[in-house]
Amino acid sequence: MRYTIIQITTFFFVILNITFAIAQDKDTLYVQEYPHKWWVKAFIPNKMLTILHDKEIYNPTYPQNIGVGLRKIIGMNLLVSFSVFPLKTDTDLSSSITDFQMHKYGKKLLLDGYYQDYRGFFTQREQDGKKVYTLFPNFTVKRWGLDGTYVLRNKRFSLRAAFEQSEKQIKSAGSLLLGSGFYYHKIVPDASQQQSLPKAFDNYQMGANIGYAYSWVVSPRWLLAGMVSAGVNFGNNSEVLAWHNLRAYPASIGRLTLNYNREDWSFALTGIFNNKTVYSPSAQSFELLAPTTQFTITRHIR
């Protein structure tokens, strides 16, 4: 099932890459194109998923990833990352993680797609000055979703300059954002959680959000940019999902990036924060916090 979702999402993004590759007018006093036909990227992503439930914080053990990417000026992007080694922990837990994310930074539209499958979490507390871990090796969280965000002031604010380093933001600018998305979540408890969470459940959500983005041109070399959107999703567990039985779920997504740009290369430190809330059939709340940080070096090639 996970590979089918990944294949469908990949196909969807390839089609959209081709569709949005058609050039659109920009205010060249604010945004300019690079003259290069290609870029090559090397990046180090750190993808995380934290669960907040019943005053407890659940974390998996994470691997360290590295990645490479390639883009031609027609708009076709290819970014691939893979695990190189697990980060050391003293929990004696080895989490199973599939974390697939795709981000399309268009001239007017931002598209985010993700599929996450995490199995194996732990909690920790202090006891007699030492860390004590409680392991939940079969506690599983699966989720996938698709977000679309429209940039209203797209002639002066460039998503690509801020988050892809494939355009140049010449003057500071901001824009109102309008977005919507569809999301699926499934939570499978560990056997040790049967008293507090007796059975697995899934959850469907659909909603809309509004936000703002701003790029601050600190100097000709440095750019600081951020965007944040907040909204409300509506949905419920599949067994009770009906128009007359919808719940409201708060949702938020944010981005922050610091870029250093030269004529033919750049580096960026970027954070993406995608947070959702779900409820079990017994109305228990689960906060799903999914931050991603990434260090990227981009080389532009003529």
PLM feature spans:
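Outer-membrane pore/translocation modules
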Residues: 34, 99-202, 272
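Membrane-embedded beta-strand positions of outer-membrane beta-barrel proteins
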Residues: 40-42, 68, 76-80, 111-113, ...
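Bacterial Sec-dependent N-terminal signal peptides
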Residues: 1-32, 222-224, 297-301
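Transmembrane beta-strands of outer-membrane beta-barrel pores
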Residues: 44-50, 72-74, 82-86, 106-108, ...
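Outer-envelope beta-barrel architecture signal
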Residues: 34-40, 64, 74-76, 107-111, ...
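Outer-membrane beta-barrel transmembrane domain signature
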Residues: 48, 62, 181-264
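Outer-membrane beta-barrel "beta-signal"
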Residues: 145-148, 152, 289-302
